Amino acid sequence: MNFLPKSRKARRRLTILAVAAPVVALAVGLALWGMRDAISLFYTPAQAAAAHVPAGRKVQLGGLVKAGSVVKHPDGLVEFVVADQRSTALVHYKGDLPDLFREGQGIVASGAFDESGTFVANQVLAKHDERYMPREVAKALKEQGEWRGDGQAPSYQGYKPGKPNT
């Protein structure tokens, strides 16, 4: 019983397909493997807590800076809490904050969680006017049913400075 096509043209096409398919699959696999460190997933604090993001994994954390949570240390370390009404995350950032960074406003921080669950940011991006919300933050808030299109800052109940509510 012969499974190969009878015509020479069909056998040639099958041979080319049998050689090309694994080569293309290998190329796509290598490209994705090479980009694994460049891919940065976006989470809100609640999503990060639910997903149990492993320590050291590069992610973006977005939400609103909780009022009264910003602490600037003499060594240049800035500590603040990012919240999304369901959960909060403590963020440490060493460096200069954007000029538009302020409490009650939306931010997106890039970095990784450490072993203690603190988000260590290497970059902080702030919204640029009263009406703008970073796309990822707005989408996440809409999915959670917490979106406020009127620009009002949400109120946070039960917040204690220095300790994130999770």
Curated annotation (Swiss-Prot):
InterPro entries: CcmE, CcmE-like_sf, NA-bd_OB-fold. Residues 1-13 are cytoplasmic. GO terms for molecular function: heme binding; metal ion binding. Its main location: membrane. GO terms for cellular component: plasma membrane. It is found in: Cell inner membrane. The keyword Nucleus does not apply. SUPFAM superfamilies: Heme chaperone CcmE. Residues 35-166 are periplasmic. It comes from the Bacteria. Keywords: Cell inner membrane, Cell membrane, Cytochrome c-type biogenesis, Heme, Iron, Membrane, Metal-binding, Signal-anchor, Transmembrane, Transmembrane helix. It is a single-pass type II membrane protein. One of its GO terms (biological process) is cytochrome complex assembly. Gene3D superfamilies: Nucleic acid-binding proteins (2.40.50.140). Residues 143-166 are annotated as: Disordered. The chain crosses the membrane at residues 14-34. Heme binds at residues 128, 132. HAMAP family: CcmE. Heme chaperone required for the biogenesis of c-type cytochromes. Transiently binds heme delivered by CcmC and transfers the heme to apo-cytochromes in a process facilitated by CcmF and CcmH. Belongs to the CcmE/CycJ family. This is Cytochrome c-type biogenesis protein CcmE. The gene is ccmE.
